[in-house]
């Protein structure tokens, strides 16, 4: 009996160390966890193509939570498309962000409802209504004349 009680604390410490290692290894999703697609911004009045963006798809809770937090920058026509299960009012934050972005809320029909030009700020919440949220480089929407009421064409497989 004494031998058993001698090993119990050692076994407990080993279990805690193993559990701690599992938690440390289950950090944010790797870039390879994301699928990629291309979306197109279209002028609502003229149907002119304004820009195309290669986006990572964030379509589950873990990917949406992490977002661009572990990204150091975005390329010129690069972004992230967040896909929610249903249209609603959502709030986005700049958790652990090192650079500014535009946050574009898009309804289920692809119409832009709100555009925020967001500076890194852990305390700010950027709100809008939509089923999709597109994050692109800062002032990308201004530089490409993308405005509220314009459309974002999203491939059918992500609609």
Question: Language model features by range: what are they?
Answer:
Residues 1-159:
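Hydrophobic alpha-helical segments
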């Amino acid at each position: 009996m004494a031998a058993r009680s001698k090993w119990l604390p050692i076994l407990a410490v080993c279990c805690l160390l193993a559990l701690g290692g599992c938690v440390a290894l289950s950090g944010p999703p790797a870039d390879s966890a994301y699928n990629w697609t291309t979306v197109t911004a279209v002028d609502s009045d003229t149907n002119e193509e304004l820009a195309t963006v290669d986006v990572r798809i964030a379509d589950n809770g873990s990917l949406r939570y992490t977002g661009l937090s572990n990204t150091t920058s975005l390329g010129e026509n690069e972004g992230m498309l967040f896909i929610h299960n249903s249209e609603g009012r959502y709030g986005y934050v700049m958790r652990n962000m090192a650079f500014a972005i535009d946050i574009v809320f898009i309804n289920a029909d692809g119409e832009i409802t709100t555009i925020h030009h967001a500076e890194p700020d852990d305390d700010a919440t950027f709100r809008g209504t939509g089923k999709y949220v597109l994050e692109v480089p800062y002032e990308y929407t201004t530089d490409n004349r993308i405005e509220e009421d314009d459309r974002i064409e999203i491939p059918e497989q992500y609609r």
